[in-house]
Amino acid sequence: MKSGTTPFIGASDSNNGVTAFVSNTNVSKDSNVLGVNYNGSVVENFYHPYTCIFSDDVKRFALREHNGNEYVYLFMKTVILQQKSKYAYGYKFNEERMQKQMILLPTTANGQPDYDYMEQYVKRLFSALK
């Protein structure tokens, strides 16, 4: 890795997962995603609204059918973290388990994820902190 200004996201549980700043690039360059650790600090995850590069130990989680924002991804972060106790050294959180992991989300009347509710919920939490 060459030193630079682009955040490099590793399987860390601190500093929003940023373990270095680099100038090189690769196919893992992304933004507006959750970086979910499946090695190292397992299931720890951070929201990355900025462009960054991800290590092989961090999977990028992006919504397919919805343009996620900070609030929706922070809601998702918490839901994903609730799975942490399930995984340990003997039962590793790998890519296959990550893809099969079921998470419970609020839904609309037609059974679709209620992204508006998720966004408003986090916004209310933020406003309560002010």
Locations of regions flagged by a protein language model:
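A conserved ligand/cofactor-binding region detector
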Residues: 11, 26, 42, 66-69, ...
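Catalytic micro-motifs at enzyme active sites that drive phosphoryl/nucleotidyl and oxygen chemistry
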Residues: 47-49, 86-91
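A short glycine-rich beta-alpha junction/loop motif
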Residues: 52-59, 90-109
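Compact, glycine/acidic-enriched structural inserts
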Residues: 61, 66, 83-85, 89
